[in-house]
Amino acid sequence: MLDVIRFRTEVVHARRVQNGWRVTSRSLDEQSESNDVFDAILVANGNCATPHIPSVPGLDHFRGRQMHSAWYRYPDTLNARRILIVGSNSSGSDIARELCGGAVRQWRISEEWQRSSENVTVYQSYHDLAKPPKSDYDPRDPASPAWCRRIHVVGPIQHIDEQGALVFSDGARLEDIDLIIWATGFLHNVSFFQAKDEPFCQAPLIVHNQQTSTAATIASADTLHHLDDWMMFYKPDPSLCFIGLPKHVVPFPLVQLQSRVAAHVLLGKIPPLPRVRAQLPISDPERWIIDEYNEAPGPEAWGNFILGREAEFVYTDTLLSLLPRSQPPEWQPFPPWRRELRRKGIEKRRELLGY
């Protein structure tokens, strides 16, 4: 494998040509560019490389500091007393827990921090106040641990006024916030594809319109368009494939399986992937049942690619059924014990880690 891997190399441009894909790459050591032509491209640059900070009206009025959760390391290095965390999924909840002294990992001054964390006031902005965190304690629940009840839950930010105060959807205001931590996810980065090139000028991966915020920039967005039912192959040209787009999954087994399936399709060892019930939500397990007679077009844009536990089981089992039978156990359907362990993930985490 080392013979075909180029380390410290950045892909700066990839475009369709008559005999394949012309890829321009740049060596970060020599600062020199090279051009190669390939039969197919598999984009596997991950879901967590381009942090997303949403556009909030008046954000330039904010007088404190800002950071994305991707840049967070330890709570004692933040040097802030009044902190707002925007987002209530895994990263936001983990950071809020550590800031309030509920940490379980050990670092140089973790015990000292747990004592001094009482001097920090933590606010957490939920997108939907009616919904408690899916996989964490609810700070508003009296039965939650003491560290959790220290978190002050607020709604989504509506705007920031000229005095630098944060105004929320219910009209509440927060002043003198030292630090905003944006736990607002990541964008898919396709900066090496140019919108003016074929076939993207006809069937763009990223579309910006007035109704949705699908495109934060011309090269990155939270939504990709014109993919097949499986969120893998680019429909106008299946020689372009994306690996690892689904979220809320166990990533390594799924990515390994997608890669194997993509290789089989591109090498002609199995037919193109069949249609499924694409009009059903991505998180619905029933969606991932093969529907060979489905002629209805699937949606042109996939939202946030959230698959989820039960749908992941059917998604992977169906993909496995398309591959030639193999002997190694890693290419078998998820065994019952593994499915049960996944279903009890939150319960096991609280039992073993305390949160």
Predicted features along the sequence, with ranges:
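Conserved SAM/SAH-binding loop
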Residues: 8-12, 26-28, 71-73, 155-157, ...
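Glycine/threonine-rich phosphate-binding loop and adjacent beta-strand/alpha-helix elements that clamp
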Residues: 183, 188-267
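Feature captures the FAD/FMN-dependent oxidoreductase FAD-binding
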Residues: 1-40
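C-terminal, flexible cofactor-proximal segment of oxidoreductases
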Residues: 227, 241-355
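Lumenal/extracellular "mature" regions of secretory-pathway glycan-modifying transferases
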Residues: 30-36, 52-79, 113, 126-154
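Glycine-rich dinucleotide-binding loop and its adjacent helix/turn
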Residues: 43-105, 109, 120, 153, ...
